[in-house]
């Protein structure tokens, strides 16, 4: 949000969106500390997210001959979002699996249990496309299941989100979203996009190079606040280095104006001060419905004057209320 009733979409995350568990944990903490507030105000519930996620995944399953066996596929305990993988699997009452827990048997994905082999019908995967299957994608992957993609292509397993959905995460594709909405739906977007210059285009690159100190530069495939430049808060040497990157690899970058994100008060060791925030809502889509959570993850930049709200960059989170 940049001003009252003025919201912008900063980016889309369709591949492995994370943060829903922290949304729920934030709510649990607030309810424990301030139960009287939830008694006084009719704050909408967020605890139903895992149940809605499970129902959405099952609704996407196309084989109706049996009740599907669902599991969560995680890169492992060293992944920064492992807590969430474990949390969601536990809340849904399904197995949390790594690639080493699985085998390919008769062109199906199978888990060995004390009761024998179980076929997995749906994998809610929390692994990036490149690492899903070393036989199909990155051969150096140590966290993917060899042969998984062949099973997927044969229709014997459902992967969610589907491989390839990450194209919508692409920051260059983001710049076309208003046109995509107009083309496919013949509608105008309800929420605005941030103006974006594609550095792959000659005139855009020229403008960006002449205005680096005013702009935010992002890697097209970047995430987590890495590989970006925030011009107004960067040193001359940092801007110089980024200029060289842009000139040598313009296709890898987009640029946007520096957005004045809204602020919320936070408690620091020196008192209460404003810090910049953004909101990450969660949407679940199945063939016949879309459900948007009654809340979301409000991410906050804990450092003074910082616009980086990513947890990987030292950001924090806040409980988000929707009041009925």
Question: Which residue ranges define each predicted feature?
Answer:
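Domain-scale recognition of functional cores that engage charged ligands
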Residues: 1-324
